[in-house]
Amino acid sequence: MHIDVIGHGPALVLLHGWALHGGVFAPLVERLAPHYQLHLVDLPGHGFSRDDSTPLALPYVVAEIAAATPPAVWLGWSLGGLFALHAAATLPQVRGLAMIAATPRFVRGSDWPSAVQREVFVQFGVELSRDYRGTLERFLALDTLGSAHARSELRSLRETLTARGEPAPEALQQGLTLLERTDLRRTVPQLARPSLWIAGQRDRLVPAAGMHAAAALSPHAQALTIAGGGHAPFLGHADQVSEALQRFVASVP
């Protein structure tokens, strides 16, 4: 699995969202690299890990990342949040957890109302097999929908998407399955490490209310909503997100 290591200081592992790669965090890298050693992961089937045959399953991926990185705060955006949360719940080397636009369960349920309908991910899976590039474009548009900086964020995501080659279709299907079926809510109250949950106020994929509901499950959590932010608030609101991360990491024992 490809992992870029940039900067010096306390370690921070960053895990990207569906169809992207570690390069998507460029605005955060610019601001955080002077203070931290950043470990930017390309998940299997994505970016420079496109040919990595590791199944996109939480235990396998987390174990491989953990073996290649030092004790660190783990940050997960969107799909990457599921891997980061699983790591925080199972590995003592995870010092803290930062979740950006990510919850332990991405689909709506009778006891989890602030989420999207399951059919959203099912339909993306169907469309992906019919129209690969068109489906990716529609997903990127959904990532930025509602954001105060939607145009510039969409432009950035489009440029990033294929900068390291196109993601593997099989990995994309596996990622959609994870988003549709994973429910890690039971692990959150057991988190022994501090956590930070950063939501975008206008996020259409992971509503801010869902982020705050997730944070409320953890005994050591902070929650922050970025005003005007969409599903990728670290793009259009990089200063706010990086400042929040620096405050959080400084507070981690």
Curated annotation (Swiss-Prot):
Cellular component GO terms held in the UniProt record: cytoplasm; membrane
Location of this chain's protein in the cell: Cytoplasm
Molecular function per GO: pimelyl-[acyl-carrier protein] methyl ester esterase activity
Sites where the protein binds substrate: W18, S78, L79, F139, L140, A141, L142, D143, H231
Any single biological process term in GO: biotin biosynthetic process
Keyword set, alphabetical order: Biotin biosynthesis, Cytoplasm, Hydrolase, Serine esterase
Residue positions of the active site: S78, D203, H231
InterPro entries cross-referenced by the UniProt entry: AB_hydrolase_1, AB_hydrolase_fold, AB_hydrolase_sf, BioH
Main subcellular localisation: cytoplasm
EC number: 3.1.1.85
Pathway stated in the Swiss-Prot or TrEMBL entry: Cofactor biosynthesis; biotin biosynthesis
Catalysis performed (reactions): 6-carboxyhexanoyl-[ACP] methyl ester + H2O = 6-carboxyhexanoyl-[ACP] + methanol + H(+)
Similarity comment: Belongs to the AB hydrolase superfamily. Carboxylesterase BioH family.
Family annotation (NCBIfam families): bioH
Role according to the record: The physiological role of BioH is to remove the methyl group introduced by BioC when the pimeloyl moiety is complete. It allows to synthesize pimeloyl-ACP via the fatty acid synthetic pathway through the hydrolysis of the ester bonds of pimeloyl-ACP esters.
Subunit and partners: Monomer.
Protein name: Pimeloyl-[acyl-carrier protein] methyl ester esterase
Highest classification ranks of the organism: Bacteria, Pseudomonadati, Pseudomonadota, Gammaproteobacteria, Lysobacterales
